[in-house]
UniProtKB/Swiss-Prot annotation:
PANTHER family: HTH-TYPE TRANSCRIPTIONAL REGULATOR YKGA-RELATED, RIGHT ORIGIN-BINDING PROTEIN. Keywords: DNA-binding, Transcription, Transcription regulation. Residues 36-57, 84-107 bind DNA. GO terms for cellular component: cytosol. The keyword Aminoacyl-tRNA synthetase does not apply. This is Putative HTH-type transcriptional regulator YkgA. Residues 19-117 form the HTH araC/xylS-type domain. One of its GO terms (biological process) is regulation of DNA-templated transcription. It comes from the Bacteria. PROSITE patterns: HTH_ARAC_FAMILY_2.
Amino acid sequence: MRYDKELTENEMIRQKILQQLLEWIECNLEHPISIEDIAQKSGYSRRNIQLLFRNFMHVPLGEYIRKRRLCRAAILVRLTAKSMLDIALSLHFDSQQSFSREFKKLFGCSPREYRHRDYWDLANIFPSFLIRQQQKTECRLINFPETPIFGNSFKYDIEVSNKSPDEEVKLRRHHLARCMKNFKTDIYFVSTFEPSTKSVDLLTVETFAGTVCEYADMPKEWTTTRGLYDPTHVIWTQA
């Protein structure tokens, strides 16, 4: 019994070390990362940290870093106007050619084809293994008809990064609070996005906030596109 308890405590320590490493890797995808750096940070030898990572995560450490960098690249390809060469070099690929080759292995097309598709296929996105302390949200899709919404729009630029978008959340909450104060009905936030014209590193987000009821002081109209939506992200309901 004592042995089992010690084993459990040791596993918890290892898991904590791995979570710290995963956080460090996520923060350094656009910086050089070597096995020596990871071994030094973890306190394990090169061989032991690779064995530990593979045993717990079921994927080799080097492969995990490579796929996370490729997924970071996919986000930059889709959401920014950065050149393929800049993306390749920022994520420490040897060349644009080697980047394109690895990208095609994971996503089945070249980075340029990926950028210009009229849809975003997320099937091969390799997510981070980070365990985040947050409440799980049940995802469900609803058929939402083409609907005219009356309200106002606001626009802002954000950096495409792994950091928490605190300023963006604060801005959207400000507009939501104002809508909830004025209207006792369902409130809709509908957003579109495109690469910013101000900087290749930025993304421009335009959000239309409003209701299906027309009010005198909300003159603008936005008609939603008919299709499948996740209501937890699109519709904000007055409590």
